[in-house]
Each structure stands twice: as structure tokens, then as C-alpha cells.
């Protein structure tokens, strides 16, 4: 569903978890290292950005771009027209890359596993699950 209250919670919890500046890099490294640990085959999607080394400047920059896209998408949760346009843009970007549907689930699961490290018991797991389902569903369907 990702109703108005869930969107509000996700938007505000994301701002707290993702933070600013160098904190974002740490968040990204934690997330991507978790993804690569649990689904090492995903690393192959990132060959052109030195995905074999999550600490390389090239991969860190790419990881920040990906999370920047998620940041923008989450920030638009309360503006349906802009949110829909962002999802359409992300869908076109991801269609070119032939990303398996399963990989979106891996991303969501790993993100949900990392968020408690930043939000603790404030994490609204249901709100995040619902809203991430809407986001990833629109991108890969």
C-alpha cells in the first residue's frame, strides 16, 4: 500500500538513517558490502565501476549515485506526480541493464537489515516493506 502515514515515516526515517556527508558513504559501504556478501553474483553487474573493490573511488561514486537516486525517490513520496515521474525514469534506466527481478528483493532485504543499525527500534518495518515494494515494483515490472 504505502499509505500517507507510511510515506511520512519512511521519508523521515530515511533522512535520519542516510544522514549527510561522509555518513552517507559509510551507509553505502555497509549496504553494498552486505549485498555482495549475501549475493556475490550481483557484484558482476558493477564491473564497469570497479565492483570488485567496494572501497575504490569509482565504486564509491557509483554507490552514492544509486543511493542518491533512492534518496530522491524517497524524498518525493509525498508528491505523487513527481514520484511517478522518478519511478518511470528509474525503470527506463534499469531496463537497459537487464537486472533480474530477484536482485531487487536482495536490495530491499539488505536495506531492511542495515536500517536498524541507524534507526534502532524506531524502524517501522511494515512501512518500509510496503513503500520499498511500491518503489521496486514500479522499477522492475
Swiss-Prot record:
Keywords: Disulfide bond, Heme, Iron, Metal-binding, Oxygen transport, Secreted, Transport. InterPro entries: Erythrocruorin, Globin, Globin-like_sf, Globin/Proto, Haemoglobin_extracell, Mb-like_M. Heme b binds at residue 94. It is found in: Secreted. Residues 1-141 form the Globin domain. Pfam families: Globin. GO terms for molecular function: heme binding; iron ion binding; oxygen binding; oxygen carrier activity. It comes from the Eukaryota. Disulfide bonds join 2-131. One of its GO terms (cellular component) is extracellular region. Belongs to the globin family. The giant hemoglobins of worms are formed of a monomeric subunit and a disulfide-bonded trimer. This subunit is monomeric. This is Globin, extracellular monomeric. It comes from Tubifex tubifex.
Amino acid at each position: 500500500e504505502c499509505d500517507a502515514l507510511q510515506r511520512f515515516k519512511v521519508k523521515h526515517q530515511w533522512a535520519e538513517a542516510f544522514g549527510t556527508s561522509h555518513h552517507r558513504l559509510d551507509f553505502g559501504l555497509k549496504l553494498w558490502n552486505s549485498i555482495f556478501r549475501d549475493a556475490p553474483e550481483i557484484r558482476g553487474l558493477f564491473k564497469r565501476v570497479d565492483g570488485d573493490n567496494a572501497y575504490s573511488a569509482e565504486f564509491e561514486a557509483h554507490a552514492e549515485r544509486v543511493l542518491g537516486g533512492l534518496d530522491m525517490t524517497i524524498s518525493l513520496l509525498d508528491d505523487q506526480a513527481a514520484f511517478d515521474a522518478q519511478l518511470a525514469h528509474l525503470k527506463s534506466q534499469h531496463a537497459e541493464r537487464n537486472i533480474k527481478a530477484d536482485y531487487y528483493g536482495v536490495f530491499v532485504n539488505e536495506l531492511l537489515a542495515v536500517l536498524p543499525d541507524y534507526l534502532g527500534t524506531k524502524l517501522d518495518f511494515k512501512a518500509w516493506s510496503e513503500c520499498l515494494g511500491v518503489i521496486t515494483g514500479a522499477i522492475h515490472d
